[in-house]
Amino acid sequence: RLVEAGAQAIKILLYYNPFDEEQINSVKQAYVERIGAECLGMDVPFFLEPLVYDDAIGNEKGLAFARKKPEYVARAMEEFSKPRYGVDVLKVELPVNPAFVAGTRAFTGEGTAYSRQEAIEHFHNTASATSGPFIYLSAGSTDEVFCEMLELAAEARVKYSGALCGRATWQDAIPVYAREGVTALEGWLADRGLQNVQALNNVLARGATAWWDVYGGKDNIEVIEPNSALRT
């Protein structure tokens, strides 16, 4: 139905604890597998966004979970990179919580989960968990924090294929709109908002790689004409 309505890709968000009970995760895995099969049948790309959590630890933004997060992200990436799921691109969280990375501008001083070098290693190790293309999501970080974390990914020589962020680039415009209205909002977006996007683009230009590089370059990509019969 989505394809009939004009969708050119499908994106699914999945809350996932890789260490949860098997009966819970087997249902989630079957759900993703079914969507992957349908996307393959309809010849549309499948983007999966797994967000990790653990109810036993609690607060996903807290220090305790921050210390466990790299392993959880790596396990989720490893699982959903398996061919049976048919995921074309993983949209993944940063493997670290920026607030707890000592030695960075993002560090809040409210506890340390990792040093800067350890964070770089976590970027490298989690990226090694998948053999397919993936992009990072900002998860509501500020544009400055998100760009700094992408710079760490570049230091780790991570072959990520870009980023997807929304409010990281425009969230500071909300109070401007509340105080001064639509005209001020549009002015902010045309000025600071544009600067935020350009700054992100500059970071991506230095660190991100094309998705086809994962497969050895564009020349190794076999282009197959879509089967129009599948869309009727």
Predicted features by range, described:
Residues R1-I10, Y16-P45, Y53-G132, M149-A156:
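Alpha/beta enzyme core
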Residues K11, F46-L48, I135, G162:
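Short hydrophobic alpha-helical runs that function as membrane-insertion/retention elements
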Residues Q29, R179-E180, P226-L230:
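Alpha-helix boundary/capping detector
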Residues D43-P50, A208-W211:
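Long, hydrophobic, amphipathic alpha-helical segments used as structural scaffolds
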Residues E49, L90, G166:
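Conserved, mostly hydrophobic/aromatic
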Residues E93-Y215, D219:
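Catalytic-face loop-and-helix region of soluble metabolic enzyme cores
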Residues K218-T232:
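Charge-patterned, long linear interaction tracts outside catalytic cores
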